[in-house]
């Protein structure tokens, strides 16, 4: 392994360790020394990779923004099938990359008041609800989804996914539910 590859592996180890500790203990209760000890490496060496805990936080938020994606335009695919396939992809990706479960928990934490403002603003910059509202309205128009406030329905869809990911983060033995179960709450 080259030095460059070793450095990238070390960087990834720091990020994954920080992610796990931030989810477990919270951002403010996790010290740089805790992260360094868990990697393991010296605190001084960790600062060669990240100048501060907030820089590390921002890097994790940027990773979270690149996650498994968001709901987009379904094209000719019926909205219920599209959402079912979307959830299937999210669960599949998370099972292949277990840190994704922690990332869902982490991103929810970062969006809360009291977190460093730059990280909070960045975490809030992605709107998953608006495209989901459009998709639900299309499904309502086509008679696939129940009548009701599409914004509330979209928020409930995402809250369900968030809750599932949090449970799977806490219980490593939990299996992903059938995506159809989640989509069925929207159906007429």
Model-derived segments and spans:
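Helix-turn-helix
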Residues: 9, 13, 17, 21-55, ...
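Hydrophobic alpha-helical segments that form the core
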Residues: 134, 147-169, 178-187
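N-terminal intrinsically disordered/low-complexity leader segments
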Residues: 1-8
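Amphipathic alpha-helical segments used for helix-helix packing
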Residues: 94-116
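Hydrophobic/aromatic residues within well-ordered alpha-helical segments
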Residues: 10, 53, 60, 64, ...
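Short coil/turn segments at alpha/beta junctions that flank glycine-rich nucleotide-binding fingerprints
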Residues: 24-25, 97, 142
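Amphipathic alpha-helical packing segments from all-alpha helical-bundle domains
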Residues: 69-73, 81, 115-142, 151-155, ...
């Amino acid at each position: 392994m080259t030095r460059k590859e070793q450095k990238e592996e070390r960087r990834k180890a720091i990020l994954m360790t920080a992610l796990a500790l931030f989810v477990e203990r919270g951002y403010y209760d996790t010290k740089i020394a805790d992260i360094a000890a868990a990697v393991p490496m010296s605190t001084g060496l960790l600062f060669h990779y990240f100048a501060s805990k907030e820089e590390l936080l921002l890097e994790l938020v940027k990773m979270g923004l690149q996650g498994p994606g968001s709901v987009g335009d379904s094209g000719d695919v019926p909205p219920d099938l599209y959402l079912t396939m979307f959830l299937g992809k999210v669960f599949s990706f998370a099972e292949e990359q277990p840190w994704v479960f922690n990332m869902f928990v982490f991103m929810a934490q970062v969006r809360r008041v009291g977190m460093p403002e730059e990280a909070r603003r960045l975490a809030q910059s992605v709107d998953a609800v608006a495209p989901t509202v459009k998709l639900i309205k299309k499904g309502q128009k086509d008679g696939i989804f129940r009548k009701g406030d599409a914004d509330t329905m979209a928020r409930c869809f995402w809250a369900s996914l968030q809750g599932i990911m949090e449970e799977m983060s806490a219980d490593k033995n939990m299996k992903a539910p059938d995506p159809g179960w989640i989509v069925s709450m929207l159906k007429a």
